[in-house]
Design a protein with these regions (language model features):
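Detector for intrinsically disordered, low-structure N-terminal pre-sequences
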Residues: 1-2, 75, 138
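Aliphatic-rich helix starts adjacent to a transmembrane/signal segment
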Residues: 29-49
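Short, surface-exposed interaction loops/tails
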Residues: 106-146
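A generic fold-level signal
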Residues: 6, 43, 103-106
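Extracellular/periplasmic head regions of type IV pilus-like filament subunits
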Residues: 56-117
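N-terminal single-pass transmembrane signal-anchor helix
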Residues: 2-32
Length: 146
């Protein structure tokens, strides 16, 4: 009688391979999500820096900061609409979130955002409240504010 040789994988080999693939994909997925969150946080920080620069230019011309900011609108000189400080005030990359602008006096302001990366070194702990709009864990302040 001739011995019959079979080819293929046993059930245990298939289960082990599937388990290893599941572990690897979980690790890669969490790294992917972490990288996306860090990218959004980087954009938030850059957005706030851009807004601060525009607000400082506004203050240099008007000697006060604007009362409010409307996200998505432009920041223009109230006396001369052709003088544009910022063509579009950026908003948070997530549609259900918003930045917060708090002008505590004519010559000071704070801009707030919520960072997603819990390990970010710029993250405030504990978070700070802003204008009754919730708590934020990242802030930039006017240049004349400590």
């Amino acid at each position: 009688m001739v011995a019959r040789r079979t080819f293929g994988f046993t059930l245990i080999e298939i289960v082990i391979v599937i388990a290893l693939l599941a572990i690897l994909s979980t690790a890669l997925w969490s790294n992917f999500i972490s990288a996306i969150n860090k990218g959004k946080d980087s954009r938030r920080k850059q957005d706030l820096k851009t807004i601060v620069e525009a607000l400082e230019l506004y203050y240099n011309d008007e000697a006060v900061y604007p009362l409010e900011l409307i996200w998505g609108d432009s920041l223009v000189n109230p006396d001369d609409a052709s003088l544009v400080y910022l063509s579009k005030i950026p908003n948070d990359p997530l549609p259900n979130r918003s930045y917060c602008y708090d002008r505590s006096a004519e010559d000071t302001f704070s801009l707030y955002a919520n960072l997603e990366n819990p390990n970010d070194t710029d993250r405030l702990d504990p978070p700070q409240a802003c204008g009754g709009e919730g708590e934020y864990n990242y802030v930039l302040k006017s240049s004349n504010q400590p």
